[in-house]
Structures are given as structure tokens and as C-alpha cells.
């Protein structure tokens, strides 16, 4: 649950030269996410790479939370190994959504704080600016020139749920940039997000996903001795022969899935 008041106080503290339009932009991004849909991912990737090459180093945290389900990721993240391609794809996957009611609530908090003197802006000016913006249908707004000169913002938005994955993605991109073949095993308890993470990686890297469910033990393998072994509930021999060895040798992978209903291997 967001705390708009705390967010705005933190924002003006982190960016003391921010103007009213910069707070408008932060709240807009908090509610609506990416301002534009990405029609051409390759063009977005090239633009990110070019912008990052000329960007001023960012003094604060690379990942900056907003007041909602989005974060700003500053382009310094590319110096930590993340590729422009991966960042562009994360940006594209974080498509704009319309949370109009939540946005209006955030604006009401902003205007109330200005009225109470909690934010360093003129109350009448704030009311007029909000009214004019609302009458125009709340189009995307830009950072003020003062903000640009002071902070040289260079970032992209992404869903906040992707932010904890950035260290992993930086590591993967670093390996791939070196031309290293990479096989990633994802482990965790039931409901921990393994399938969700695997699906995201498949979207980001156009890579195959091999599910452990396809390698459950066949009935004849289910013995007390087998279940007493670490990882004994997995047909690791078949996983090794049909998937891991071909991957290691750079060969095509063709494997049989285990059917949990018939308890047999599919052809």
C-alpha cells in the first residue's frame, strides 16, 4: 500500500530543486507506469545505449521506488552488467496501465500538502496547474528544465516486481556478453515464484524452459530407497541424459515429458 505523503516528502528531500511539474511527473509515473508503449524494441534498445553513453553518473540509488507498482531504474545499471537489450525488454513488459482513481487520490494528497505548507509551492499555482492538467486529460508531462540541469535524469520505468531480479539479470547479461553458454537452475519451495521467474526469463532471453514436473519419477522408480536420497523425487538420470548433456555439448534437446495423469512418459 502506497503512502503518497511520505513519497512526496522523500522526493523533495532527494531532489530539492524539483518543481511542481516534476512532482506531477513522479505521480503520473507512479499511477500509470510507462508513458508510451514500445512499438520497436530494437529502437528502444539503441536509444537506451546511446543515452547511457552520454548520461551523467547518477548520485543516488540506481533503483528508485515510486508511489505505486513502478520504479525508476537509472541507466547506470548498464555499468553493472545489465544490457541495453534486457532493459529495453523490461521497459516494454512494463506497459502503461490506467489507474485513474488512484492517480486522482495522489493528486489530492499533493494539493493538500501544498495547501498545508508541507511542500514548497504556491497553493494557488498548484490548484491552477492541476485544473489545467485535468482539463487536458492528464497527458504525460516532462521534467522541468531546472530539474534537467540539476540532476540530468536518465532512467527507464519498470514494474517494481522486476527490481529484485536485477542482480541476477546483470550476472546473466555479463556472462552472455562474454559469450559464455549459461544454464540456470531455479530452486525454491512451492509457490515461491519459480515458474513466474522462468516465464519472464523466457521472454527476456528467448530461451527454453525445462520444468521439473516433466521429470517426475515413474511408478517403478518410486521406492523407499529412492525417496531417501537428496533430490530422489526427480528423474535426474533422464534429465541428465535428455537435457543437461545435450545442452553442455551444444546439441539440440529433445526430451519426453512425464504425464502426471497416466504416470507414463509422453512419446
Predicted regions and their residues:
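Long, basic/Gly/Ser/Thr-rich N-terminal segments
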Residues: 1-147
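N-terminal pre-Walker A segment at the start of P-loop NTPase domains
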Residues: 151-176
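Short hydrophobic/aromatic beta-strand immediately N-terminal to the Walker A/P-loop
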Residues: 183-185
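Conserved lysine of the Walker
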Residues: 194
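Conserved nucleotide-sensing/catalytic segment adjacent to the nucleotide-binding pocket
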Residues: 208-211, 216-266
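Active-site signature of alpha/beta-hydrolase-fold catalytic machinery across serine-
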Residues: 200, 204
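Hydrophobic positions on the alpha1 helix immediately C-terminal to the Walker A/P-loop
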Residues: 197
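P-loop (Walker A) phosphate-binding loop of NTP-binding proteins
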Residues: 189
